[in-house]
């Protein structure tokens, strides 16, 4: 496909569910249908095809999502991320309480120079967006493919400083 648009179900499934066992390269720990749908959307795109999905933001840094991030951000590249400040105003007519983002991804091996990150308070104030253009390597970083959702220049500067550290806290003996 040239384009895929999705609002997949947000639902954890058992590790031994057929959907999870069919995709062991992306499923680890506690699989969720939304990232299985997103993986299949990306898989079914033609080269340079685009997808837009509204999904929870938990995949951006959660340990259970590492395999998904590795697949998703190797086969595709983030071009735009939209953040909602409110957890309960995205699906205001439903009882969904979820930190939700909209992502635009292109199926390509070519890494873009930047990612656009926009944010709004709810699903009804897209006319009042804040917008930030951030270097791709600052947003998607590390061997775990973490996605850093910065919203202003101060956060960008903090992230630049953090990326200069070459060791993790556990690597220097700090335990939590």
Task: Map each language-model feature to its residues.
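Signature of N6-adenine DNA methyltransferases within the class I
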Residues: 1-176
């Amino acid at each position: 496909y040239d384009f895929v648009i999705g609002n997949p179900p947000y639902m954890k499934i058992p590790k031994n569910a057929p959907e999870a066992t069919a995709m062991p390269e992306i499923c680890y720990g506690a699989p969720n249908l939304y990232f299985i749908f997103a993986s299949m959307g990306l898989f079914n795109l033609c080269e340079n095809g685009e997808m837009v999905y509204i999904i929870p933001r938990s995949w951006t840094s959660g340990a259970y999502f590492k395999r998904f991030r590795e697949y998703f951000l190797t086969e595709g590249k983030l071009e735009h991320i939209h953040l909602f400040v409110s957890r309960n105003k995205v699906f205001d007519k439903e009882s969904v309480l979820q930190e939700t983002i909209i992502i635009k991804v292109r199926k390509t091996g070519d890494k873009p120079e930047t990612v656009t990150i926009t944010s709004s308070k709810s699903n009804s104030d897209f006319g009042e967006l804040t917008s930030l253009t951030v270097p791709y390597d600052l947003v998607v970083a590390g061997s775990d493919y973490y996605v850093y959702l910065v919203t202003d220049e101060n956060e960008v500067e903090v992230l630049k400083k953090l990326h200069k550290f070459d060791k993790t806290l556990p690597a220097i003996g700090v335990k939590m």
